[in-house]
Amino acid sequence: MHQHPRSSVPSPAPNFPPRPTARDDRREQEAAPSSPTVDMGSNSARGLGIEPGPQPSEQGRNAALGREALTRLNQIISNYHTKAALIILHSRVALPPSFNKGSESPRVNRWFNVELDDTDVLREPLRPWRTCDATDNRPPPLVIETYLDTKGLTNNQSLVILDENGKRWDVRESLAALQGARAKPYQSENDEIILERWRIELGESSSRLPADLGSILPTVYKKSIVLFRSLFTYSKFLPAWRFSKRNKKLRQSPALQIKYRVVDGSVARDDLSLDHLTAPLSEGSEKVVDTYSFGVTESPAGPFSVQVTYRTNCDFRVDDSEALLSSRFMGADDEIFRPSLPSDDVNRPNPEIGSVPVERKAVENPDCTRAYGSLSTFHQVGPTTGASPISTLRAMRDSGAGSPSPTDSPKRLLPPAKVVPSGRAGQIAGEGGSSNFQRRPSVSFQPFKAPPLSASPALADSPLGMSPRNMSSRIPTGTSADSRVMPPPSSAASARRPTTIASEQAISSSNSASPKPAPISRYSSSFSHRRGRLSAGANRLEDDNSSGRASATSSNAQPGSGLLTEATGTSAESIQADDENISEFLKMLDSKKDLMNSSTSASIQPGPSTTAAALARFRGMRDSNAALSDSMSQSMHMHRSSISSSKQLSGVPPMVAGTSISTASSPGKPMSPHTPHTPHTPAIRSRLSSNSVADDIETDHHSRLPRIHHDPPLEEHSSAENTRAPSSTAGAIDIPTSPRIFNPAYRRSSSAAVRRPIVTSDDDEIFPFGIRSLSLGADESANATLGATQQQNESQKDQQSPAEDRSGPSVSTTGPYRDSASLRGQMSGPTSASASSNPHVYQPRFASSRGRGYSGGHSLSSASSSLARGANLTPHLAERDQDRDGNASGSNSGNSTLEIRRGSGQRPSTGRTLSGQAPEDDEPLLFAMSDFGASRRSLDEGRHGNHGGTESAAGSRRGSGRRGAGLPGFHVWS
């Protein structure tokens, strides 16, 4: 009895589960089916009431199982829509999270094994889908749209979209153009651009709910997990997601913030309205929208489906309205007018700003530099580098485009730069032109400086001895017409004799094979009208006879003008091109009178006051400049032959004496004693070049002869400052000797320019030549040098003939080599002790050889190279050689003259009478001396009057034996 009332208490338990299914409380609905223990409790409670009868309990149990399965199915349908909306919107917009009661942690939605923060924002928009069921209240299709609202734009902002080509399109104008054809457009959608449209739909069921619904629902739930995971992943691959992420990083305009709305898909849309999702916003071949379906998930209530339609291009931006309008105007005439023939300005590179006379002949399609002429006379149009033509062409390859011409400039354009003519034609044009600008002197060069294949000079100026540039080397272009005109530096003759601003120095180098142009100032010296002289003797006559072209030493060029690139030859093509372009160049100069603008020239060139002050200061230095020019002229005349011959010393190290100054190997410009741009070379004799004084005898003979006749012979004891006072006042410097393969037994005297006192003896009456010792030290008493020898020869020429007749046989049997052999074989202690004081002892340079340079080494001498290059001998030298040697052969005369210059000819025998035997009897030498015996026998025959071909052959043999034919193939420098 007690159990029946208790059993009646749980009997209404199956009625509790339907209570949480009320539509007004969602949380209770979700909590009730989530706890299966409630259902089990009800079943157990129902199982306890079996006693009333089997029929009522079976029907109630089946009804309870059906209601439970249906409740779970309804929960799946509800969460199917809400979870899809949560996944889609969480990846597009920022949703505020919802919190549990009494907790600060956000509530997490874990349905379908995808954890997302739950939010209360979607409760109201999704209410119809949260309260739906599978039988009575089926859910309508859920449509979620993401869009951009243009109402947040200001008046000067426009929403634009970039097409596949990068062109901007105004979205509002595109929509307005599309809505113009619509009868009733939705006003709410006028300013909205739909990006995506998601559709979540539950299809109609084909049959009634199955009886085993509870066993089918777990399978439906597992299939939905796969669907929602794919939805979560694919939603982050669409263009709208990339657009939203970019906006979050850049924090762009509020108009670019993605918005959303939830729409009932069952509401029919008016066909006349414009769909802002499929409306094309730009012209192009790309597809406007695309559709993706996630498949169908079968359920007892019907098929579940998720589908998305999205814009393929979501590259939206907010631009300024005026900028967008300006860009349209700039490209408005692209397709309006297109000429049938191409314009000439298309292929014309680097237009130059400025006006040009209409009659100027335009060059049709010039190349990158318009270079003409040979490598020696290189002219170009464009930026100049001052280097070789190859380097200039290489640098012009990367030249950038010039400044665009203004709108008011004529269509006819200038070439990239002016063509600067070269040669005499350019000089005539500079003198005859009526331009206010000073003409730059033209430059040409002597052909084939040694070596003929010269390397290109460096781009940079030489770092040694350079004076700073005081004036700019180029005239600025693009200036206005009301600019100041630079005043001429001097009076009427300013075009021919400009005043010097800064003199540049040329640096000599024995290693460099090509001259590098030294920087030249804007204004040259007022003495630049004087003719310059190259130091080479062979080029002097050519310089004197050249009428049209100035030599390289007397010419000036602007730094970086491209004219001093290669000091080789003057090409006939460049001269012809200069003559053809003179008229055009003068017209261009007349039209460019407005180049000297104060705005640009002030930063480049000094003002007129500074220029005038500098010119006035340098005008006062004309006297010192004249004295300097005269001093340089004398010193260069003295060293012309020695300097010119030094360029043949290719195997000599850089600092070896005799190669200190060279015109062809200087890195700077060629030197001249008459131009202020050449350095002042002091008259310092080097050791190698002091052996040859061909030019000293040639140029200073008339100035020395009166002094020699009036001075007594005892004055020869004076130094070189007394004898050579008119020529030079500089002393000699001790330059290190050249490298040699044998250790020298004696040190060579450094009496190159300083004249040592001449020690006279009794033999001077017979041998008037002061013999110079080549083996004495610098501090020891040396014999008279070659200058003193020549002076004694000049003063005692009349008394010399009898002495030469007496000394003929002695000289024929003696000589420098004979003396050296005798000294090596017979020198004893006293003889060695007196060797330094004996003025007639000729000691060899090497103790065990015939001397330095006799196997071809003498060709390095500046005297022999000067003769080989064609240095002319004066007639009185040839006559003196014939009187002394008694032969008229050209070979003997040349060799005798060379011996006189070397100080090695007609050496006395120091009082000892030696027989004419072969010198091999005295001491075994390093080289065979048979050649010298034959030459001495021929010389003996020549002394007795044989002046025929035999003497000529013997003289040639003697010269070859003394000049290095003794042992072929041996060279002391090798």
UniProtKB/Swiss-Prot annotation:
Location in the cell: Cytoplasm; Preautophagosomal structure
Pfam families cross-referenced by the UniProt entry: ATG13
Compositionally skewed regions (Pro residues) per UniProt: 11-20
GO terms (BP aspect): mitophagy; piecemeal microautophagy of the nucleus; protein localization to phagophore assembly site; protein transport
Listed GO CC annotations: Atg1/ULK1 kinase complex; cytosol; phagophore assembly site
Keywords: Autophagy, Cytoplasm, Protein transport, Transport
Job description of the protein: Activates the atg1 kinase in a nutritional condition dependent manner through the TOR pathway, leading to autophagy. Also involved in cytoplasm to vacuole transport (Cvt) and more specifically in Cvt vesicle formation. Seems to play a role in the switching machinery regulating the conversion between the Cvt pathway and autophagy. Finally, atg13 is also required for glycogen storage during stationary phase.
Protein family: Belongs to the ATG13 family. Fungi subfamily.
Protein name per the record: Autophagy-related protein 13
Source organism (scientific name): Penicillium rubens (strain ATCC 28089 / DSM 1075 / NRRL 1951 / Wisconsin 54-1255) (Penicillium chrysogenum)
Gene symbol of the encoding locus: atg13
